Amino acid sequence: MKNLKQTTILFLSFLAITLQSCNSSNVDKADKYYKDDNVPEAIKHYELAIAEGDTTATNKLALLYTNEHQPEKAKEVYIKSFEKGNMEAAQYLANVSLRDEKYNDVIKYAKPLADKGNKEIVYALGSAYLKLTQYDDAIKYLKMDAGNVYVKDPLGQAYYDKKDYINAEKYWKSAVDDHQSGAINSYNKLLNLYKEQNRQKDYDAYNGRY
């Protein structure tokens, strides 16, 4: 019984090493084929590596399709990867869905990541909720990365759309005051807010800052 157990462990170890070697071999071959402009063979070997469970091959194949101006094929690769539990794929799909204005898809891909504390995804998720006029959810997630200059723009907008002008001003003003770049949207919205509220003195103080 002991010998059988040891034999089983050795076999599983050998199998794992063999699979890892095959994966690496197929990825290496695909890399070489792509470097040599043999796209069909590169795709073939990336797909073989993916079938063997290599997640790096997924990213490389999607990047290949992106570089070859086939974004829909890249998206298909990531969707299949997401369905297998690849969270890197979820991040890519969330950002692509935001670009394509498919806001419910953004939530589908991004919310599980954000709920686990991933701050990199909250801009896309919060922006999607904002577009769907779900302001409380937008604020909830955007505040996870409220120090980010790019996040301050939609965060301020969510408050503005709720008619909470004090907090809208707070975040837009912070973007302009605390960041040397990246705040142009917040800057323009801050000036428009001051104009709407007939706050000429504040408008003059910030006009020309960016």
Predicted regions and their residues:
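Short helix-capping/linker turns of helical repeat alpha-solenoids
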Residues: 52-54, 84-86, 117-118, 147-149, ...
